[in-house]
Each structure stands twice: as C-alpha cells, then as structure tokens.
C-alpha cells in the first residue's frame, strides 16, 4: 500500500515509519510512505504557509498555493508508477468518524493521500476541488491533522497483507466482528490472587471459543450497548446475550 502525506511536520511520521509493526512493514516494502511539506512549495524567503481568512476572525488558514502545489505533487507521484490515482483524504473534525468498517473500506484502496491541516484549517475551495473524502477520529479538536493521520495509517496498515504475523490478529480485534474484544491472559497463572480462567487452561477449543464469544458479548453489552443495535446477531449470540442479561438481572 502506498500513502502520501501532506504535512508541515513530516518528521512526526517517523513514529510510523521507524517503529513497531508499521516500521517493519515499511522496511519490508509492504507499506510505502512519502511526505510532501507545503513549505517546500513556497517562493518567499520566510517560507510562509499561512494566510488571513476573509471576513476576519481569530487564527489563520493554510495558504492555498503551497498546499495545492504539494497536493498536486503527491497526486502526480501516486499516478506516475502505474497510472492508478490515489484517493485524497482530508483529516478534519467535520469528516466521517473513523470506525473499523471505515478502516476496512480505506484499506481496500491501493493508494491514499492524507492532508494534515494546521491553524484554523484550509480554504473550502481546496476541499471542494482536491479532496475526495473527509475523515475524523473523534468529536474533538487537535492542533493539527498529523496525529489523526498516524492513527488512520496504523489502523489501515493492519489490513495490508503480510503486515501482521497472523491475519487472525486483525480479524479478532475489537470491532472486527462488531463486538468488543474478549479479555486476554498470559503467564503467570496467578497474579495478585487473580487466576487465569480455568476454561483457557483446559485445551478444549470449542469451550474456549464459546467463552470468548460470551465475554465479547458481555463487554459490548455493558460498555458499548449501542454497538449491538446495528448487529445481526446469530442464534448462538442471541442465546448467550439473553443468558448474560439474565445473570446481571439476578445479581
């Protein structure tokens, strides 16, 4: 997968390219990341990248010309190798909220260009003419789009073939099935007087599967019950959920 990044602070993306699972994916050429800094497309000695908004008000906007030129350079680079164009994403609090289904959808693209805003944002006309989709990571405001872009990259990279040691790691994550993940345990068997659940020590794979499913359902019902509203539960899941609700009603 190829990802182009438009950012005034490309150095921040070393957190993605140099460390962990994504860093290994970059080294193995499973994930290719290139950055374009709008400052490199300025013509004045101060490398100005901000401008005043029409109508006044606090703050500045990203200057149109350097940002647009950086976007065009990234688009050309994306298309140069095989003619495939990249989908252009603007990270914005006004965008569609990123969830696991959205991550899967974005991961189906061969190429993405991520625009990281700064200041008070970018000219609306650039969004209309250069951007395909706007995405948000939540209902809050950050100082820039770099951290949302890194969040998106990290989430999307997990669905690139070969990035994870086992694809099941992605398939069994929280939200992968629409449910929260079940609890997990490792050694020691006893920690501060709390044992590992016996079923996980039994070696009985079917019982372990059912226990994990029940735990996932219980956690989802207790912590994020709204997630269940959009799920088409299986017969097994409905029976387990009824059991869970009955147990909590009794207790």
From Swiss-Prot:
Its EC number(s): 2.1.1.228
Record bears the keyword Nucleotide-binding: no
Subcellular location: Cytoplasm
Record family assignment: Belongs to the RNA methyltransferase TrmD family.
Protein name according to UniProt: tRNA (guanine-N(1)-)-methyltransferase
GO cellular component, one term: cytosol
Cross-referenced NCBIfam families: PRK00026.1, trmD
Keywords associated with the record: Cytoplasm, Methyltransferase, S-adenosyl-L-methionine, Transferase, tRNA processing
Keyword RNA-binding on entry: no
């Amino acid at each position: 997968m190829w990802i182009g990044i438009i950012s005034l602070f490309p150095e921040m993306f070393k957190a993605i390219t140099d460390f962990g699972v994504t860093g290994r994916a970059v080294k193995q050429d499973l994930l290719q990341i290139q950055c374009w800094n709008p400052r490199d497309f300025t013509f004045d000695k101060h490398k100005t990248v901000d401008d005043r908004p029409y109508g006044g008000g606090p703050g500045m906007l990203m200057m149109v010309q350097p940002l647009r030129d950086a976007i065009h350079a990234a688009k050309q680079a994306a298309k140069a190798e095989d003619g495939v164009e990249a989908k252009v994403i603007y990270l914005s609090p006004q965008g569609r909220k990123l969830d696991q289904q959205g991550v899967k959808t974005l991961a189906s693209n061969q190429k993405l260009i991520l625009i990281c805003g700064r200041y008070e944002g970018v000219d609306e006309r650039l969004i209309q003419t250069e951007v395909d989709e706007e995405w948000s990571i939540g209902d809050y405001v950050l100082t820039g789009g770099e951290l949302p872009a890194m969040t998106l990259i990290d989430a999307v990279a997990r669905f690139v073939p070969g990035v994870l040691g086992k694809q099941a790691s992605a398939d069994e994550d929280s939200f992968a099935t629409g449910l929260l993940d079940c609890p997990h345990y490792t050694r020691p068997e006893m920690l501060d007087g709390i044992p590992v659940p016996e079923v996980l020590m039994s070696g009985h794979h079917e019982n372990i599967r059912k226990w994990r499913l029940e735990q996932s359902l219980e956690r989802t019902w207790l912590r994020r019950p709204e997630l269940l509203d959009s799920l088409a539960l299986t017969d097994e899941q409905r029976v387990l959920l009824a059991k869970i609700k009955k147990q909590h009603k009794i207790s």
